[in-house]
Amino acid sequence: MNQAREIQQLASRFLYDECDRMYTDIGEWTEVQDCITQGIDSLTKLEGITPEEEAEAALAILMGYAVAVRNNRNIASTLKRARKVLPKIEDKVLKCHLTVFCYGECFDSKLAEEAHRLIGELKNEGKESEVVTVEALLESYEF
């Protein structure tokens, strides 16, 4: 699902980067926001073939709503979608990211515990660079 990854990358710019430096033109900023919103709308109608594809789509939707105009009904259905697929995901990095974004929407302590466990495992596997941003995001949610 290339579209899911594209939305994740666009949303990441707003979540993790200095987007105030990137978008000095309001027209460009609006264009990116519109692209994210259109991508979210498209992804809510698609279903992944594999658990990983479904997780990528759910993650992109939740990331998109973290930086764009929110739609609580779509967020709720995406959370259901994510919770259904989370136990089936083998990719720990993907599972960790999706778990953190789910936690950021519902603040379920079990999700936070799972995210911390996954972050710890990934660090022990030498994949710290892949979780540094999501770990900081988790900490900001727990604040």
Question: What positions do the PLM features span?
Answer:
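Amphipathic alpha-helical repeat scaffolds of TPR domains
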Residues: 1-23, 48-67, 91-105, 132-136
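Short coil/turn connectors between adjacent alpha-helices in alpha-solenoid helical repeat scaffolds
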Residues: 18-33, 62-77, 103-115
